[in-house]
């Protein structure tokens, strides 16, 4: 189900590089398809958008009424609301500090020239939120609100022909008025040519990422990260909580069939135990089919012999999310140069960050 590579020799290193390159390389068919969708939406606007939504998502309702949104939120579990409220507070506090510190960057040189960093909000931003990820909405929209972005447009696809009430609740909490039920490359094209926002942020599948790449710096503001399917790398040892390790891998695998989930360890027996935990989680997972495809296609266990190989492997993988699920994480953290976010310690899963 999940491939295993021994990193201890040149053959193993080459296998790892080949595994990573296979996923990173663009598919010309995808590029051409996305380009066709973009040009169609640019020319035919809502007519084309509705056609692609019906074709790919069986969705016939793009613009949502206030009543529909309110009715959906009414059925949201109270505990989920509490979790969103708590996450909102944490994210807001962090980014408020970020803006405060940006405004402190000032310098007056010996000639009395004043140099300073000025933070100016753009007028509008489109936020793409995959259907099951209210956290994505919070992490993208809260900074925009704090920065002073006047207009936020939310694009989120339906799952099984339904919008996630948790996403709608988070949007309401942030005062977002423009909520559109759409996904894929057609959603990015719509944000560029119909809603006409200045910039688009938020993760998505390979078609979303490719649409952002093609429009970046042309119609939309330049995007420095196209945020495709999710990536996670977990470092674990015999003292790690294996259920937590397996949960972290599966939690990213369920995002998308192209998500990448990698475990790095010195312990061969640990890989067998983690695989057993993964199978246990999958047996009760609503998104089992997606997660299973992801793990089969892009799941990997890397066996290393020493700490030097751990550092080499992680820096080669350059994961979006890295969990150092070991007690002695401090001996690794300063040597890791290529990782988006790092969760340090055995009780810091990525989902808690």
Ranges and model annotations:
Residues 1-123:
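N-terminal Rossmann-like NAD(P)+-binding subdomain of aldehyde/semialdehyde dehydrogenases
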Residues 2-10, 178-183, 301-306:
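Short acidic-hydrophobic, aromatic-tinged amphipathic segments that line or gate anion-handling sites
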Residues 106-169:
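Conserved small-residue-rich beta-alpha loop and adjacent elements
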Residues 110-111, 159-163, 182-189, 329:
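Short acidic loop-to-helix transition motifs that present clustered carboxylates
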Residues 175-260:
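Conserved NAD(P)+-binding/catalytic subdomain of aldehyde/semialdehyde dehydrogenases
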Residues 225-297, 301:
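A conserved active-site cap/scaffold subdomain adjacent to cofactor or substrate pockets
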Residues 316-353:
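C-terminal core of ALDH-fold dehydrogenases
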């Amino acid at each position: 189900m999940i491939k295993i590579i021994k990193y201890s020799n040149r053959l193993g290193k080459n296998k790892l590089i080949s595994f990573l390159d296979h996923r990173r390389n663009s598919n010309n068919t995808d590029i051409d398809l996305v380009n066709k969708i973009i040009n169609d939406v640019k020319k035919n606007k809502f007519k084309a958008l509705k056609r692609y939504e019906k074709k790919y998502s069986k969705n016939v309702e793009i613009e949502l009424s206030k009543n529909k949104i309110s009715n959906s939120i009414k059925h949201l579990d109270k505990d989920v609301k509490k979790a969103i409220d708590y996450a909102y507070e944490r994210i807001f506090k962090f980014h408020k500090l970020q803006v405060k510190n940006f405004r402190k960057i000032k310098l007056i040189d010996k000639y009395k020239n004043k140099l300073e960093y000025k933070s100016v909000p753009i007028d509008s931003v489109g936020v793409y939120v995959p259907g099951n990820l209210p956290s994505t909405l919070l992490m993208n929209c809260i900074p925009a609100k704090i920065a002073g972005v006047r207009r936020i447009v939310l694009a989120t696809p339906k799952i099984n022909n339904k919008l996630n009430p948790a996403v709608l609740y988070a949007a309401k909490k942030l005062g977002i008025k423009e909520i559109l039920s759409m996904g894929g490359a057609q959603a990015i094209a719509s944000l560029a040519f119909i809603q006409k926002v200045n910039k688009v942020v938020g993760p998505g599948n390979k078609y979303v990422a490719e649409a952002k790449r093609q429009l970046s710096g042309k119609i939309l503001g330049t995007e420095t990260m196209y945020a495709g399917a999710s990536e996670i790398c977990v470092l674990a040892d015999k003292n790690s909580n294996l259920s937590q390790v397996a949960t972290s891998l599966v939690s990213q695998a369920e995002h998308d069939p192209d998500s990448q989930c990698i475990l790095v360890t010195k312990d061969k027996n640990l890989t067998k135990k983690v695989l057993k935990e993964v199978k246990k989680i999958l047996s009760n997972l609503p998104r089992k089919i997606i997660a299973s495809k992801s793990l089969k296609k892009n799941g990997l266990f890397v066996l290393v012999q020493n700490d030097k190989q751990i550092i080499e492997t992680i820096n080669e993988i350059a994961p979006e999310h890295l969990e150092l699920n070991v007690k002695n994480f401090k001996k690794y953290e300063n040597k890791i140069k290529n990782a988006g976010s790092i969760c340090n310690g055995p009780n810091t899963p990525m989902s808690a960050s």
